[in-house]
Amino acid sequence: VYSQYSKISYEPLKTAAYTHTAMVDASITLLAISRNIRIERAKICALFHDYAQFVDNCPHDQHAKLSSLYCSQFLRQTELFKINEIDDICYAISRHSFKNKYDSPLCEALKDADVMARFLENPECELSDIEKQRLFKATADIQK
């Protein structure tokens, strides 16, 4: 993922790709530990969740689905994961933009980590009511 980000020629987009992905990775790691979610799967979700948005500059409403397809292709090529593991990871990535819907524990962790990352990158960013709820719940879970 990061090797592909290094090829982004527009410097602000490259910086955003590195920064946001790293922040989601750190956030989901804490959430996975606190929520007893498999860390490896969580971190893969973090790495790929916005991949298509940064690498292909695709429209926001399509980035989650396209990112999940990239992830599926990558994981299948490694031959290190079972089909159900790949499906679980890719489902979470494909659904992470639907912050107002409740999904699998892995998907919920990714949604919450995405919101946490946005807040940590810019504490003055505008958050919707559901994003605020997610941020408060995520920080409470980490404090447990």
Language-model regions: role of each:
Residues 39-58, 63, 67, 88-97:
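His-Asp-centered metal-binding catalytic motifs of divalent-metal-dependent phosphohydrolases/nucleases
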Residues 9-37, 48, 77, 95-144:
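Divalent metal-dependent phosphate-bond-processing catalytic cores, especially two-metal-ion Mg2+/Mn2+ enzymes
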Residues 83-87:
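All-alpha amphipathic helical-bundle segments outside canonical DNA-binding/catalytic cores
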Residues 1-7:
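Short alpha-helical hairpin
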Residues 19-23, 63-69:
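Short acidic alpha-helix initiation/capping motifs at coil-to-helix transition points
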Residues 74-81:
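Post-HExxH zinc-binding segment in Zn-dependent metallohydrolases
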Residues 15, 19, 55-58, 62, ...:
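A short glycine-/small-residue-rich loop at the edge of a beta-strand within enzyme catalytic domains
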